[in-house]
């Protein structure tokens, strides 16, 4: 297998991953246009300022230096009219679908000096401060998406209305290596209380969960939710009622000092337990919130300016903006063939009815809106698969994401069978059986006998050769890999695998299906483990190898804390299952050589039937290691010594060295066209944080890439503060 020649994905001219993702582009200026609106019932004149970049809804309104300067000029002019007695209220709103999406990140990433960074924060504070100092009531009519500095624009107003269909209100800065820098870290805890503020500023950004208008109203971020159809008119009427005293919006008292301290101390402990100091932004944001109770507005905003300037000039922020650019550009997949070549998919077959098969079947039925048939060997397996689909539909219904009528239609579109002939009229058949090459080959051979010559065959294999799987078929060109990740509905990545003889039509169909499923598709060559599993399994292999050499399990498990990964290695092992982990590690060792360590201790655990390495801990307690697990590794080492134990730093260095070397091999083999695609896969398929930029920016900034490969993986300044 290691000697096979596979097609190498080729970057295209417009490939977003081959340019400096965080490099500045020309500012899309957010214009601030003021007009007068006559308030009803003689309440006076409202100056309505609309933020609009003059582009369609696919180009969100963001603020760069010119936009902030224009907003400052417009609000200054409005304030002059207020002082002249011409205006009794001021409101801000946005173009259709957007209030504003915050600061222009490409402009932020272009900042190279502390003076520029400080000016960015101070400029926003000065502009928004005009709303606070206007001298008449100010309103934000939140008609659409309001993120970061866009939402802070609203927070600096006295009152906020929101349209009922608004689904994205957030301060996502800490997820991008920044802090809310235009008032949010001070205003939110004083508006909604310190506990809810930390949800807004820390918890939801980490989970990428913005607020809907209704959720924001419940905690007091907005004051009223109004019907979308006539939102602007209703907002104006509501503002008039506020001015006449008919509507009084209550504001909560500040939390007492003891509560404030207890909540922020608990939040700091949670950060220590989860990200272990790996990311500065959440800690800086927490510091700002912790002092928001007792600082004056001026002191708090000056502290925001300092924190923002520090973070803008950090590698973590540059990596985060780079990662954001990768994910944003991921919907335009690199190397995908002409979409017009894709075959129509009106009916899908799934071979297998296990957990992954059922998840794939449900998602296909839901997103493609086509009939799906699951086939397995006996009625019992088919029944289990259908029950898994039913449970998934019930979860969607119970959370309000499906109406009862839609749920009934969805259930009716998925059926099970033991008869292979029921797949005959499927345009696409996906196999999702056990990871055994001979079994998958047999499945494809059987399916090919009943489907049409134009039907596309796809495999959900996570590591096996798609080329070998298709080798004995009459039409191997119809086979493509579609590697979904578990849980299928939640994980946004699909690795689309181009085998040696995959046709452009089959490949285009794979990309089209991934797009209709709202997944980000990355083209990968048919090499063992593809991208995500090749790197994750190597990481786990190196960790286990350290334990084989005498490193205690707890030490090895803690070693990767500086990376701030979504879960420690042995927790990931427990999620995958020791047996599956051993199987894939052994398979990759056979295909790729001794870079993938063997593990006698892990083999013994599997022989003993062990399914969990770290038993579940009590709430708030660290997960303990079962002494029997450590004893098994110790016994295996006594029988066959493999080396010397390592400390945490040694384990981390071993992991980073191995990952760097493997990425070098992957690029040489053409598994993907660019390092950026590896980063995109690790972000979306392994949940690695934006602060890492995936993986290659971290390897560059720690010097691993130059030490191991003799070169950087990315150009200097693409995902880091330029060193020159």
Q: Where does each model-flagged region fall?
A:
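STAS-typified acidic loop motif
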Residues: 42-69, 96
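Long, basic N-terminal domains or extensions that often function
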Residues: 151
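Short, active-site-adjacent cap segments at secondary-structure transitions
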Residues: 97-101, 147-148, 464-465
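Amphipathic alpha-helical interaction surfaces in cytosolic regulatory modules
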Residues: 71, 83, 96-110, 128-131
